[in-house]
Design a protein with these regions (language model features):
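Aromatic- and acidic-residue-enriched segments that line the glycan-binding/catalytic groove
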Residues: 73-81, 112-147, 236-245, 331-335
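Conserved small/polar residues in nucleotide/adenosyl-binding loops
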Residues: 1-7, 435-439
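Active-site-proximal helices and loops of the catalytic beta/alpha 8
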Residues: 94, 124, 185, 195-274, ...
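C-terminal beta-sandwich/jelly-roll accessory domains of carbohydrate-active enzymes
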Residues: 405-438
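Loop/helix patches that line or flank the sugar-binding groove of alpha-linked glycan CAZymes
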Residues: 8-14, 31, 36, 262-417
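Core domains of carbohydrate- and sulfate-ester-processing enzymes
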Residues: 118-162, 250-266
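The substrate-binding groove and active-site-proximal loops of carbohydrate-active enzymes
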Residues: 23-41, 73-85, 159-172, 190-198, ...
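N-terminal structural segment of carbohydrate-active enzymes
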Residues: 5-103, 118
Length: 439
């Protein structure tokens, strides 16, 4: 069939995401002293028009909730971080996005909590007698940590600041499902990106999926998964999507090494997992900016053409549409999460070639259902040139990219089409049995 998952059509199949790390973008202090709320989230309201202008239709924003530092050591799942403002501010922000027809998903940090979370504090206070002992993994009163609590516990990633929740405990499951219900009723959120989904318990994710189905039609669950067979997570029982780190790696190294075989092989490998709508990205708050990563800055264009046209849901990390740089440092991700003022980029779509390209690709994708639902077929592949087709209901979209310093002629089978239209240029190319395209 020509139809690529079309029977499951939902807003997220056609979405183009924008990704904001709010504590960074708003320039919030690194440490939360839990003092009176400061409404920094409101400074992001002017970004909403920009998000629409570059063609994005959904926003992934987070972490948002009360925490002591970078946002992933949660203190309170039901309260906006004081450094960002009040729950009322968040409610208004989501409503403003919805007014512009932008869906909103929050970061859900459910693998671990911070040490200031109420259940952990209860264990510190009541020790062996705490009713929350089984909310965490491997609490051991024969051990200790650098915090000198008089007990040890399982953490995430070697950081004792992040205390691993016991997701098999029905009380924990019920509590987190209740958090999701609260986020929907209080803020009208449209989905959740699950932090550290690759270490979440599968039964726990099944419980989240059941809750997602109850709270809102088309409520989207997307998980952070680095390695592995993505179909273990993306299926009818657990998550709708996961982060496509495999394609992320291939997109930059396939250009840096002049090796389109790596990208084509990765796409084939992903296709073999089934029709998964993966969350595609070239950078985010944890990895170096694409503009920094690319040896040849001119490759910004073919990288993003592929991001927007290969199977999956594309995402842009705030600031990367302007071509900003950001190098990962050894002990800090601050350089990847800068404060920016949208006023400094007022005419970016007109004046910045990177932004103009992203806006043009956004428009093309929005008006080309084959890029969301079409089947995928590789047409031509060399180290330096790559062509593929997306087919849907008799419409064929052909994408050609070239990573060489010189223009290249590519001969491609024209299929049954009478003519081709060069989408970025608008010029028509008559179709013969083979069509020559200069990439």
């Amino acid at each position: 069939s020509d139809v690529y998952k079309r029977q499951f059509m939902s807003w997220y199949n056609e979405a183009i995401f924008y990704h904001i790390y709010p504590l960074g973008l708003t320039g919030a202090p690194k440490h939360n002293d839990y003092s009176a709320p400061v409404s920094r989230l409101n400074t992001l309201l002017p970004w909403i028009d920009h998000i629409r202008e570059i063609g994005c239709t959904a926003l992934y924003i987070g972490p948002l909730f009360e925490s002591v530092g970078h946002g992933y050591e949660t203190t309170d799942y039901k309260k906006l971080d004081s450094r960002l403002g009040t729950n009322e501010d968040l409610k208004n922000f989501v409503a403003a996005c919805h007014e512009k027809e932008i869906k909103v998903i929050f970061d859900g940090v459910f693998n671990h909590t911070g040490r200031d979370f109420f259940a952990f504090k209860d264990i510190q206070q009541n020790r062996e007698h705490s009713r929350y002992l089984n909310w965490y993994c491997n609490v051991n009163f024969g051990g200790n940590t650098e915090y000198n609590d008089g007990f040890s516990y399982e953490n995430w990633g070697g950081y004792n600041l992040l205390v691993k929740l016991n997701q098999r405990n029905p009380e924990v499951q019920n509590y987190i499902c209740d958090v999701i219900r609260f986020w929907v009723s209080e803020f009208d959120v449209d989905g959740i990106r699950l932090d550290a989904a690759d270490v979440l318990d599968f039964d726990f994710m099944r419980a989240l999926r059941r809750t997602a189905a109850e709270v809102k039609e088309d409520f989207w669950l997307m998980g952070e998964v680095i390695h592995g067979d993505y179909s273990r997570w993306v299926n009818g029982e657990t998550l709708h999507s996961v982060t496509n780190y495999a394609l992320h790696k291939a997109l930059y190294s396939g250009h840096n090494d002049h090796n389109y075989f790596e990208i084509a092989h990765t796409v084939k490998y992903l296709q073999n997992m089934g029709n998964l709508d993966l969350y595609n990205f070239v950078d985010n708050h944890d990895v170096e900016r694409i503009y920094t990563k690319l040896s040849n800055k001119a490759h910004f264009a073919p990288v993003h053409v592929l991001l927007y046209t290969l199977p999956g849901v594309p995402s842009i990390y705030y600031g990367s549409e302007f071509g900003i740089e950001g190098k990962k440092e050894k002990f800090s991700d601050d350089s990847l999460r800068p404060a920016l003022d949208i006023k400094d980029y007022a005419d970016a779509v007109q004046k910045n070639p990177c932004t103009a390209l992203i806006a043009a690709l956004g428009k093309i994708r929005q008006h080309t259902p084959a890029l969301s639902y079409g089947s995928y077929a590789e047409l031509q592949l060399t180290n330096r040139q790559f062509a593929f087709a997306r087919d849907l209901d008799g419409i064929r979209v052909i994408v050609t990219v070239n990573n060489d310093d010189n223009a290249a002629d590519m001969s491609l089978p024209a299929g049954n089409c009478a003519e081709y239209i060069g989408t970025l240029t608008g010029r028509k190319v008559p179709a013969v049995s083979y069509t020559h395209l200069r990439a």
